[in-house]
Amino acid sequence: DSDLSMRTLSTPSPALIFPPNSPGFQNGRGSSTSSSSVTGETVAMVHSPPPTRLTHPLIRLASKHQKEQANIDRLPPTNQLCRCARVCRRWYNLAWDPRLWRTIRLTGETINVDRALKVLTRRLCQDTPNVCLMLETVIVSGCRRLTDRGLYTIAQCCPELRRLEVSGCYNISNEAVFDVVSLCPNLEHLDVSGCSKVTCISLTREASIKLSPLHGKQISIRYLDMTDCFVLEDEGLHTIAAHCTQLTHLYLRRCVRITDEGLRYLMIYCTSIKELSVSDCRFVSDFGMREIAKLESRLRYLSIAHCGRITDVGIRYIAKYCSKLRYLNARGCEGITDHGVEYLAKNCTKLKSLDIGKCPLVSDTGLEFLALNCFNLKRLSLKSCESITGQGLQIVAANCFDLQMLNVQDCDVSVDALRFVKRHCKRCIIEHTNPAFF
C-alpha cells in the first residue's frame, strides 16, 4: 500500500490529501489546492509544524480557543483546519485540538479516501491513543475510492460516531457497514444511498455475542437512507427491522425488490417510524399500505411515488389510520381516483404537501374535497393530471390561502384560472407550461 508521492516526516503532522489540480477537502466554502508537481496520483502532503510564529488576521481563532468561547456550529471545516495548521507552531497545536474536529468532510471522486481517513484519525488519536473521542460526524459522500478499509478505520477509531454519510460509495460492502454499527454504539444517522453492495444492516457475529450488554443486540440508528440499494430484499429488510427498532426515518427509494412482505416485517419491529419512502418500489401494493397504516398517527411523511399497484384501497387505509399525515407523494399511482382523494382530504385535514401528479383519474371533484377540508395545504402538485381544469384550481385557490407552490405543468388550465390563483394566493409559485401566462 505504498505511495511514491507520500512525503512522511517522523513528527505527526497535518495532512492535505487531494488529487493534483483539483479540490481536496471540501465544505462548500473553498478547498485546498496542491503545490506538488506530481501528476496522475493522489497526493498526501505531510508537513511538520512550522518553527516560527507568523502574524495573521486569523489570530482571533487562537484567542477564541484560549477563552474557550468557540461556537461549535462555527468550527472551521476540514480544509481550513489543515491550512491553519501550516501558519505557525502555535496554530499547528490549535488546529489539531480534537475539540475542533467534531466533523470530517471529504468529497471528490479521485481522492484517496482510505489514506485520508487513516492519516486524519492517526493524528487525532495522539492525545487519546487509538481513538478519536470527539469525532461525531464523518461525511465522505461521492468518494468512489472509499473501500471497506476506510470504513474499518472509522469503526476502529471513532467510538463516539453519531453520523456517517457514504452515499455513492459503491465499493463498500455489508461487512464494513456491520463493523461500523457494531463498534460505534452511538451511531444514529446512516446514509448508504447508492451503495449497491449493501444488502443489510446488522451487528457482526462477534458483537452479537460480546457486546450484547451494551447493545442489547440492537442498533441505535434512527435515520437510515438506503435509496438505490437495488439488491436489498425482504429478508434483508427483515434483518434491518429486527436490529434497528428505533428507526424514525427510513428511505427505501428504488429498492425494487422490496414487496409487501418486507413492509410487514418492518411494521412488526419498527413502530416509531415518522418518515417512510418506498417510492419506485413496484411490488408494493395495497396490502403494503395496510401494513404501513399500522403506524397510525406517528406517520407524518409517506412517499409511494410510482408504486403502480396502489389504488384507492391503499389510500383509504392510510387516510383512516394515519390522521396526522403531513406529506404524501403519490405521483404516478394511476389507480388513485377522486374517491381516494376524498378519503384522504376528509381524514388527513392537516395535510400540508400533496403530490398526485400523473394520476389521470383525479379530476376537479377530488380538488374540491381537498379545498374544503385541507385548509393548511402549502404545496400541491397536479402535473400531467389530464382531468384537471381551471375550475378545480379556482376552488383550491379560494380556500387554501397559504398555498406556496402549485405545479400544473402539462395540465389543460386557462390563463384566467392561473391569474385567479395568483390573485388569491399571493405567495404561491406556479409551475406551468402555458406560454401565455407570465
Report each predicted region and the residues it spans.
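CRL adaptor-proximal regions
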Residues: 1-68, 437-438
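F-box-proximal linker/hinge
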Residues: 47, 55, 59, 106-157
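The Skp1-binding helix-loop-helix core of N-terminal F-box domains in SCF E3 ubiquitin ligase adaptors
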Residues: 69-81, 98-99
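Short helix-loop-helix/strand-helix junction enriched in hydrophobic and basic residues
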Residues: 81-98
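Conserved hydrophobic beta-strand positions in leucine-rich repeat
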Residues: 104-106, 133-141, 162-167, 190-193, ...
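Short, solvent-exposed loop/turn at the beta-strand->alpha-helix junction
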Residues: 110-117, 144-149, 170-175, 196-204, ...
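A structural signal for leucine-rich repeat
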Residues: 118-123, 151-157, 177-184, 200-217, ...
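C-terminal interaction modules of eukaryotic adaptor/scaffold proteins
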Residues: 373-438
